[in-house]
Amino acid sequence: TAGLVAALILKTRFPSKKIQIIRSEKIGIIGVGEGSTEHWNEFMNYIGLTFQDIIKNCDATFKSGIMFKNWHDKDYLHSIGPEHEIINGQYRTYYGKVISHDWSNKELNPLGTWENTVDEWHLDNDSPYNQFHFNTQKLNDYLHIIAEQKGINILDDEIKDVVLSDQGDISYIVGEKTNYASDFFIDCTGFKRLLINKLGAKWNSYSKYLKMKSAIVFPTEQKQEIDLWTTARAMDYGWMFTIPVWDRCGNGYIFDSDYITADQAQQEVEELLGKKINVGKHLKFDPGALDRVWINNCCAIGLSASFVEPLEATSIGTSINQTFLLMHRLPNYTKKSIDEYNKQIEIVLHNIRDFVALHYVTNKGHNEFWKDIKNVPLPGDLSDWLAHWKNNLPILEDFIHTGSYALFKDPHFIQILAGLELFNRDGLLSEYNMLSDANRKLADGIREERNVLGMNKVMIGHKDFLQRLRAKE
């Protein structure tokens, strides 16, 4: 996916440049299903796709966010959707009221989400959500077609070696069928990192902070109604994701192999589901990122550049933002271009690392694994921020240092902190009560507006909505 995303963005930005993809049909893709972040909409708009295209061609479903089950005393939904744009920058006032007054978690999420319903108005208008679940294979097949339509040459070959010039650049790559020379190379070879490793890139592990290192993936049948969210369920030794696409669900148990084996992980899942599962793959990984994702005339994107456990479905979003930044830095690039790019991407990846680590600041402690998780150190200055946020809602200014390409900022952190009940409600109430009467009334007005909209909208089930979309010409 990363290679196709990168090629499509770069071809759109540089239409006169020859771009080709080398991929091998013998090498499969990782994933039984895939989810996006809200950055997918920027990608679609940039290359000229519509949400109807994605729904029809990729067995896609809408994604409002991620439902966290069994991580805390109450389930909660991390949902950042277009509805927040309606609030015109005042969501913090509303969030402050919701959290400090202990309103339901549903009040933080778009209308109808918890009921798996969608406003019928969207059938002929804008997408109700800016995130999606995809059938990974169909997504790749569809992007392949779009890439060829845009003039990207896709060649079936397997990379065997990389040859460097005397100056240390990549001169050409050696394929099974022929050699390929180019001015610039994008390494999307996944965990193998065939190109960037040749240039001396080193792996910086996040395993000190993120303990998951194995996964089993497997499909299950689709439910009668299709969830509007990815489910992330805390398990005895990690967590399990469920990604609902049109005709089935893709699942994976992400676990710490220091505590259980893959067979034991499978047994735990089967006991939970009450049935046997067919495990497609057993994956092992070391969470982390390259020390430099851009070296000389090569940039690593996707799994070649980084891998943080898929708790917040960051893989596609990271590839998109990496490529958008690259397209600005690439023309007439200098050593300064490369250095600044690497600094910015390191910040992006640390933002993901810290956000994922936050999810494990939970009160779970029913077994040795979850007790040990409590003693895992927090990365960077996250512990200092948690102490600050205990009595203060996160604000955009807390994330200025992350730049415009970071995936997670104040609204995302607010929802996880609220879901894990890491706020001191009295502190937030004190902050809220310092607001003017007009601003406090605004928070009540937002709630009233939601209630009025809820009464007047025609809401239909997610599956029914998708069926109607798929049937439209």
Q: Residue locations for each model-derived region?
A:
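N-terminal Rossmann-fold NAD(P) dinucleotide-binding loop
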Residues: G3-L4
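Extreme N-terminal leader/targeting segments of oxidoreductases
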Residues: L8-K18, Q137, D141, H462-E473
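Glycine-rich FAD pyrophosphate-binding loop
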Residues: I9-G33
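Dinucleotide-binding Rossmann-like beta1-alpha1 core, especially the glycine-rich loop
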Residues: V32-D119
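Long, low-complexity C-terminal extensions of enzymes
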Residues: F62, H328-E473
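Predominantly flavin-linked oxidoreductase catalytic cores and closely associated redox partners
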Residues: I9, S127-E268, T323
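Conserved mid-domain beta->alpha element of the FAD-binding
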Residues: G288-R353
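Conserved FAD/dinucleotide-binding core of flavoprotein oxidoreductases
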Residues: M235-D286, S306-G317, R329-N332
